A protein has these predicted regions:
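Short aromatic-glycine-enriched beta-strand elements
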Residues: 42-51
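Short nucleic-acid-contacting surface segments enriched for D/E, G, S/T with interspersed K/R
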Residues: 69-84
Length: 120
């Protein structure tokens, strides 16, 4: 039974790591333009729902501390604000889901993962 519990714990840890890492996302970065529908600053990471021309997207930000260090807090934007997101979208093309490396709200550009931003 202990062996089974260890296997389950290991698999759950791997799934959490895969989700919070980058392995679930494309290598190429994509730009998404839209309007913020909602903002959640809850752990494990803040999430924006963004209404774009092709539907509602889930945009994952960094962990709460990292997101705040980038300059983004729950007061930085509101529903209805225009946003441009640079990030890596899900490998699953049918999902409107991406992880942001940079967001621009109005004139304010915030780099969540500056080391991951690819120069074109």
């Amino acid at each position: 039974m202990k062996h089974f519990a260890w296997i389950v714990a290991t698999l759950l840890s791997f799934n959490a790591f895969a989700h919070h890492g980058w392995s679930w996302a494309e290598e190429e970065q994509t730009e998404l333009k839209g309007t913020i529908e909602s903002i959640s600053m809850s752990p494990p990471h803040p999430v924006l729902k963004v209404k774009a021309a092709d539907g509602i997207w889930q945009v994952d930000l960094g962990n709460p501390n990292q997101t705040e260090r980038s300059g983004f807090t729950g007061e930085s934007a509101k529903a209805g604000d225009t946003i441009v997101v640079l990030g890596n979208r899900s490998l699953e093309k049918d999902k409107k889901h991406m992880k942001a490396v940079r967001i621009t709200v109005g004139e304010r550009q915030l780099d969540l993962y500056p080391e991951r931003i690819k120069k074109n």
